[in-house]
Amino acid sequence: MIASLDLARFPLGIAEREALALRRAGRRSDAAFARLLLPMRLRSMPWPVPRLTLAYYFALWPDEAALGRFRGGPLARWDDARERLSLTLRPVRGFGSWGGADPLGGERSEGGAGPVALITHSRTRARDLPRFLVADGPVVRALEDAPGRLWSDGFVDDPARLDSGTLSLWRDTTAATAFAYAPGVHQSAVKAQRDGGWFSESWFARFAVEASAGSWRGVPFIL
């Protein structure tokens, strides 16, 4: 199994059209799991305050051939975007569920020495939303200042259900795990969530970045 994360920046008014077209095409693809992610500013999470010029697409594929067919077919329409970044990812490990199951199906692999991607997803219980918002602010600020963070952003999967998550790229596994597991505001928020049961489901996954093409925010992402 391999994974893909594709980011695109479009002129205002174009991103929604392109994203919806890709969602329809994705339903007919060989992807084992695919989500069109609605980019949201992390500081607004989980409220659906959209970033109207961006579109993100995350998927899991049985092999590189299946991913290649999708990127050479339906995803090629994103080639006209103002900016694009395509990442090919290898699942390292995942915990929890997204949509009722672990998208990785328990698959694991050894981490590498290069950049890594972290993806989180959660569905917040409405009654616990105020507590989540109070705890989330310091975590977002800590993430933005974390050593080794290359990029991060938020997304909403289903605004009506308060489904939200984060995407982040890191220099290496050491930097990513230091933020995720070291004592501090993030671990305090994780403990508070677990003790309070704020989420009806949540998922965390780490991926090794195997290949990249393009740039983001004007900076090439080079392995």
What is each model feature region?
Residues 60-61, 170:
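Signature tryptophan residues that serve as conserved aromatic anchors
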Residues 178-179, 185-200:
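Extended hydrophobic/aromatic segments used for targeting, binding, or gating
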Residues 167:
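Helix-loop elements that line ligand-binding/catalytic pockets
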Residues 1-55, 62-72, 78-164, 174-182, ...:
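Short S/T/G/P-rich N-terminal loop/turn motif that feeds into the first structured element of a domain
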